[in-house]
Amino acid sequence: MAKGEGPAIGIDLGTTYSCVGVWQHDRVEIIANDQGNRTTPSYVAFTDTERLIGDAAKNQVAMNPTNTVFDAKRLIGRRFSSPAVQSSMKLWPSRHLGLGDKPMIVFNYKGEEKQFAAEEISSMVLIKMKEIAEAYLGSTIKNAVVTVPAYFNDSQRQATKDAGVIAGLNVMRIINEPTAAAIAYGLDKKATSSGEKNVLIFDLGGGTFDVSLLTIEEGIFEVKATAGDTHLGGEDFDNRMVNHFVQEFKRKNKKDISGNPRALRRLRTACERAKRTLSSTAQTTIEIDSLFEGIDFTPRSSRARFEELNMDLFRKCMEPVEKCLRDAKMDKSSVHDVVLVGGSTRIPKVQQLQDFFNGKELCKSINPDEAVAYGAAVQAAILSGEGNERSDLLLLDVTPLSLGLETAGGVMTVLIPRNTTIPTKKEQVFSTYSDNQPGVLIQVYEGERARTKDNNLLGKFELSGIPPAPRGVPQITVTFDIDVNNILNVSAEDKTTGQKNKITITNDKGRLSKEEIEKMVQEAEKYKAEDEEVKKKVDAKNALENYAYNMRNTIKDDKIASKLPAEDKKKIEDAVDGAISWLDSNQLAEVEEFEDKMKELEGICNPIIAKMYXGEGAGMGAAAGMDEDAPSGGSGAGPKIEEVD
C-alpha cells in the first residue's frame, strides 16, 4: 500500500442507504457516521445557503422536497428515455430533464438553477462515506472498493466508477453486491464449515434486487449464476402504499394531494415507517397532522393490506431465483444455505416466499444492512495487501448479461454467454457480407434477445482498409476481453493485412467524457470549499451568540451585578442587546462580519469585567465567556508591573 494513502475502505453505495467498512485489527469495522448511525441515507439536498448530504438532507426533505434528491442509483448509467427512468420520475418531487438522453437533476441552489448528472449526486454520497471513514481513522483515504448490483449493465458500472473518480477516490475494484455479501457470510461461517457449499444470496435492497448462486469452498467463492431486477426494491413497496393512501385521502376528503410535493413527502416518510413497523406487528396507525389544507390524516394499515398491495412485486422476486437455479443447472434441493441481504428482506412475506426452498431455515446471522460493506472492506484489504491472512480468498465472479455483436440481418451473435466467469477472453472469426466490401462495422451489444434491436447497444467501431475480395473470403478475428471489473474491450483484426482496431466499451452515449469528469472533480472541490465556508460561518455565528448570551447571564448574576457601576452595566447591556438584534437580522452575514462584531463586543465588555475583577485586588479569573487575552484594567487598577530588560 502506498504511504500516506491510509487504509483502503469498502463502500456499499446503496439506492436509499450507504454503508462503509474498513479492515482493522484483524476484523472488519463498520463505521458509524456523526449521528452514530452505521448506515447513511443516500440523500443530497441544496438549500438557499448550503449543500446537505446524508442524515441532514433526509431530515429536511419535507420542507424542501423539490431540492432534495434520493434514488440517484436508479438513474445512474441509464438513458432519460428508458421506461425505468420515466416511471420513476413520476414519483420524484425533484425536477429532471434529459440532456442528449442523459438524465439530469435540476436544483435551485443559492438562488441559481443548477443541473447535476446522477454520477455527481452519487459522488457526493461517496465523498460523505469517505469523510465518515476519514473522521474515524484520522487519516486521508484514497483507495476504495465500491459495490454495484450484480445485474448492473456495463454503462451502470462505468458510471459508478466515474462517480468514484469525481469523489477523488481510486476505485480499486467494482464488485457485485451479492458476491460481497457472500464474502461476509463465508468468513462468518468459515470456522464451522468444511467441504463445498452451494449458497444462494437473496439481496433485496431499497431500489435493486439481485440473486446470486455461489459455490464456496476453502476460500474460493465461485459465482455460478446471477439474476435480478435493477428496478425493484423497498422504494417500490413504499410507492404502492403512498398511491393507496393518496386514493384513500381523496375518497374521504374529496381532495387530491398528488400535486403537492410536501404532502406527498410527509406521507412517504410515514409509509416507510409503517412498512418497517408492519414487519414486527400485524397492524399500525399512520398519524400525520395537517397533511393537506389543515386536514389530519390517521388511517390504519394492516400487514395483510400491505401484502395485498405488493403481492405481484413479492411474486416477481421469485422469478430471478428460478432463473438463477436454471442457469446454474442446479436443483433447489442442492442449495445448502439461503442468505438474506438488504433491509427489505426483513418483510415477513419476502421471508415466506423462501418456502420455495421447502421450509429451509434462512441464514440471518449476518446483518442484512451491513453485509455488503463488510465484504467490500475485506476485498479492499486484500487488494491493498492489508488483510494478510485473508489473501487466500479468491473471487470468481460472472458477467450478468450475454455479450455479442450484430451480424447480417440484425442477428445477435453471442461471443460471451451470460454467467461466464470473469476475467475472460473469447475470439471468433467473421467475414464480409458482400463482394469487395472495404470495411466492416463492429456493433457490440449486451442482452439475451435473438435480435440486436431488442438488446442494448454498448458501442461500435469500423475496421476499414480490407483489400477487395469476394464475400466470405476476408478473415476478421473479433476478440472480446472482460477484465475483473466487468469492463469490456473489443478488438477486430483483418488477418491478411494485419489491420487492427479496438474499442473499450465505455457506452459513449451516456458516458461522461474525460473533460466532463475533470469539470465535475473541480466542481466537487468547489462545493467542498463552500461546505467548509458554511461551517466556518456557523462556528463564527455560534461563537458570537454564545459570547453575547454568556455576557448577558454574567451581568444578571447578582454577585457580579452588585459590583458593577450602573453605567458600566448599562453599557454592557446595550452592547449585548445590539449584538443579539444584529444577529437576528444578519443570520447570513460573512465570517468576517461575525468576527468583527465579536471583536467590537469584546472591546466593550472585556475591559469592564477585567476592571471589576482587578478592582477587587489580584485578578480572580475572568468572567464567563471572557477571553484570556482581554485588555487589562485601566490606570491605577491593581498592581503595576514593569518590564525588566
From Swiss-Prot:
Cited Pfam families: HSP70
One GO biological process term: protein refolding
Keywords, ordered alphabetically: ATP-binding, Nucleotide-binding, Stress response
PROSITE patterns per UniProt: HSP70_1, HSP70_2, HSP70_3
One example GO MF annotation: ATP binding
A GO CC annotation given for this chain: cytoplasm
Region (Disordered): 622-645
Matches recorded under Gene3D superfamilies: 1.20.1270.10, 3.30.30.30, 3.30.420.40, Actin, Chain A, domain 4, Substrate Binding Domain Of DNAk, Chain A, domain 1
Residue ranges of the TM segments: none
Family: Belongs to the heat shock protein 70 family.
Name by which UniProt lists this protein: Heat shock 70 kDa protein
Organism (species): Zea mays (Maize)
Lineage of source species: Eukaryota, Viridiplantae, Streptophyta, Embryophyta, Tracheophyta
Recorded name of the encoding gene: HSP70
